[in-house]
């Protein structure tokens, strides 16, 4: 696989990267917490519209394992979510609609939910996770209206730029679909964060870095980099047990992250460098269950890269 030879970003020069927590703190003058909510949606590749079973890596909660229940009114969800972080001193929040596809459903119902969340003074912004094939003109117009009330970020799943991977994991969209929707959202001045997953067992390291290149070229404002978790109750988890798929070590993952950061423009916001699935459901890699140790190792590794390059 051939990559561009020029260095397209400042990360490659000194490995400084733009942490989203720092962006929010500078913007709002204090630490801002992201609280996970649900709009009570499903997905078109779960209900038969495009497919069944969902993406093979996705949990029964639609990758919203830490989100509040979608059966609760949004005000109640927010109050419950706030209690989880108020003990840390949290007073300002991003309302993150995380579970399933949060623009898939009746637009009037969704707009009512999002508007109610945006109307709360402690909610500074909305973050809405969705799929590129669930952003029709009516949804774009809704997001445009919401963006005039509070800043809106659309968190858009890419997962991989590899077409074979997208077929295997049952996403039911293409990388070009993703790129077209990023362009449309940016035309409406809506912030976009791309999600990619690293560690699919059939992908090479070059494939994974190419996904980061693809996001860099798509025009997205930010990125979430997520290591593949094999979870109980998912097709991916079943396949892991059946085929004994190899998993990355923490050391291997950290070096891969270094390569991915090197593929990104210096102004791109980094929203996540890894994730933590529900421990009770985690099959592998088990080291990801210790989030503090994982993040400390990754931070120290990236710092070592910065120190090494500064000494050259």
Q: Model-flagged regions — what are they?
A:
Residues 2-22, 30-33, 222, 230-312:
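Auxiliary Fe-S-binding modules of radical SAM enzymes
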Residues 2-74, 79-94:
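N-terminal [4Fe-4S]-dependent radical SAM core
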Residues 33-37, 93-95, 126-128, 152-156, ...:
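Hydrophobic faces of well-ordered beta-strands that scaffold small-molecule active sites
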Residues 61-81, 85-107, 122-135, 151-177, ...:
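Core AdoMet radical
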Residues 81-84, 135-149, 179-180, 209-219, ...:
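Short amphipathic alpha-helices and their capping/turn segments at secondary-structure boundaries
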Residues 85-87, 114-121, 141-151, 183-187, ...:
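Acidic (Asp/Glu)-rich catalytic clusters
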Residues 111-117, 144, 204-221, 277-299:
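Short, electropositive alpha-helical surface patch
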Residues 176-235, 251-274:
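Conserved C-terminal portion of the radical SAM core fold
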């Amino acid at each position: 696989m051939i990559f561009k030879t020029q260095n397209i970003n400042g990360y490659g020069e000194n490995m400084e990267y733009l942490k989203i927590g720092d962006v929010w703190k500078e913007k709002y003058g204090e630490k801002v917490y992201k609280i996970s909510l649900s709009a009570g949606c499903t997905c078109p590749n779960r209900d038969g519209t495009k497919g069944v079973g969902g993406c093979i890596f996705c949990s029964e909660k639609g990758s919203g394992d830490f989100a509040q229940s979608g059966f609760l009114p949004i005000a109640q969800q927010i109050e419950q979510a706030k209690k989880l972080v108020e003990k840390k001193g949290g007073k300002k929040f991003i309302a993150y609609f995380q579970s399933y596809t949060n623009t898939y459903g009746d637009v009037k119902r969704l707009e009512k939910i999002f508007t109610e969340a945006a109307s709360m003074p402690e909610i500074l912004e909305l973050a809405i996770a969705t799929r590129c094939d669930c952003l029709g003109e009516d949804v774009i117009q809704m997001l445009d209206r919401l963006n005039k009330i509070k800043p809106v970020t659309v968190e858009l799943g890419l997962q991989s730029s590899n077409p074979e991977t997208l077929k295997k994991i049952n996403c039911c969209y293409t990388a070009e679909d993703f790129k077209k929707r990023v362009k449309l959202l940016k035309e409406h001045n809506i912030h976009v964060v791309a999600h990619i997953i690293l560690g699919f067992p059939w992908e090479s390291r070059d494939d994974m870095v190419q996904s980061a290149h693809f996001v860099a070229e798509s025009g997205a404002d930010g990125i979430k980099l997520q290591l593949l978790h094999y979870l109980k109750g998912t097709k991916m988890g079943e396949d892991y047990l059946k085929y004994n798929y190899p998993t990355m070590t923490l050391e291997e993952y950290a070096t891969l992250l270094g390569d991915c950061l090197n593929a990104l423009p210096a102004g791109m916001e980094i929203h996540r460098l890894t994730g933590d699935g529900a421990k009770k459901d985690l099959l592998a890699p088990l080291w990801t269950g210790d989030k503090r140790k994982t993040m400390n190792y990754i931070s120290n590794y990236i710092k070592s890269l910065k120190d090494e390059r500064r000494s050259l």
